[in-house]
């Protein structure tokens, strides 16, 4: 009985020590850039009402700058559109309010 308690204590200590010794890794995630809309890469913005030739960003982004860079890489501007319909964005705004 004494041996089983020592064995349990040693096992638990080893378990906790190995859990503490493992490094944590963080992965970047997308921020909520478009709080009330869908992120889109669009060709032309028409007075914030309609945007033409929109598509979902072709690559991952983590913040507004990287979202802008992803869209610029395909020759488009970054927009947040409330209603993306058939390649057109309706009621769109810039994610950085510029």
Curated annotation (Swiss-Prot):
Transmembrane segments: none annotated. Pfam families: Hydrophobin_2. Disruption phenotype: Does not seem to affect germination and growth, formation of sclerotia, ability to penetrate and infect host tissue, nor spore and mycelium surface properties. GO terms for cellular component: extracellular region. The keyword rRNA-binding does not apply. Disulfide bonds join 34-80, 41-71, 42-54, 81-92. InterPro entries: Cerato-ulmin_hydrophobin, Hydrophobin_sf. Its main location: secreted. Gene3D superfamilies: Hydrophobin (3.20.120.10). Keywords: Cell wall, Disulfide bond, Secreted, Signal. It comes from the Eukaryota. It is found in: Secreted; Secreted, Cell wall. Residues 1-21 form the signal peptide. The keyword Signal applies. Belongs to the cerato-ulmin hydrophobin family. Aerial growth, conidiation, and dispersal of filamentous fungi in the environment rely upon a capability of their secreting small amphipathic proteins called hydrophobins (HPBs) with low sequence identity. Class I can self-assemble into an outermost layer of rodlet bundles on aerial cell surfaces, conferring cellular hydrophobicity that supports fungal growth, development and dispersal; whereas Class II form highly ordered films at water-air interfaces through intermolecular interactions but contribute nothing to the rodlet structure. This is Class II hydrophobin 2. It comes from Botryotinia fuckeliana (strain B05.10). The lineage of its organism: Eukaryota, Fungi, Dikarya, Ascomycota, Pezizomycotina.
